[in-house]
Each structure stands twice: as C-alpha cells, then as structure tokens.
Amino acid sequence: MASGVLPRRRSGYTTAVTIGAERFYLTANQRDDGSLGEVFLHWGKHGTSGAGLANSYAIALSAGLAHQVPLADLVRPGIGQFFVPNGHTDDPEIPRVRSAVDYIARRLAIDWLPYPERAALGIYTLTERVQRWERATAFAGARDGYLCRTQTFGSM
C-alpha cells in the first residue's frame, strides 16, 4: 500500500464532547500500522460557518497525516488557541479548553501520541496529572499528598 493511502476498511472511533453548550463529534481512523490516518469533525448544521471551519480543520489535519507530517507538529499550533466556544467540557480527561481546536489537539495528542511526545507539549492524562501532583507534593513534611505542618506554641 502506498504511503498515505488508507485501507478501504479501517478501524477508528468517534468521540462526542460538549464544549460550553456546543456538541462536537471527532472521528479518528487509523492506518493498518495503528497510527492515526485521518480525522473528521462535525459541529453544528451542515452549511454553517462552524461546520465549514471544523471540516476545513479536519481536512488540513488529514492532509498533513497523509503526507507523513508528525502528529505532534500538527497539534502543537492548536494547543491554547482561544475563541468561542470555550470553557468546560464533559470530557473528564480534558475538563476545560480555550476552544474547539484546543480540545481537538489535546484529544488527538492523548489518544495517539506516546507519553514523551505529549509531555513535551504539556499534555497529560488525568492519571498522569495526579501522579505529577503527588510527586511534586512528596517532599519532607508531606504525607499522602497533604502538607503536615508542626506548629510550636509558646514564645513569639
């Protein structure tokens, strides 16, 4: 099979997420080797600006993947992009985002990039964030992630 060409039948998944009050659907399909091969985004009604922009972003991501652009290079510019809709999501691994593009970049990174590449982008799973917090608070005087302070009463 030629580079960048996906099999006729391929595995993938669709993630539904609400950002603010808007519902998005992200479909990610993989190549035979298990790497990410193409992305589809659905947002709002067909023909609206949002639907067109989401589709254009998905086409750009998929074209980059077809030309062997590393996924980290494709998602890096989207991380932290700020525009509406933004705010809280119903995805426990990504509870808050600055935009739909920010969410897509983070979700693709979590699902498709190995830990070292995600860590270089500052993207961690919920479990990894908890582990990082526990390591950061595991210093002298810390117990079970909580700071224990000794207070001395007497002369001041």
Task: Describe each PLM feature range.
Residues 1-29, 88-156:
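Catalytic or ion-coupling anion/metal-binding cores of large enzyme and transporter domains
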Residues 16-77, 81:
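Function-dense linear segments that define catalytic or interfacial modules
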Residues 41-45, 85-94:
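Short beta-alpha connecting loops at secondary-structure transitions
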Residues 62, 66, 80-84, 106-114:
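Generic secondary-structure signature for well-ordered alpha-helical cores
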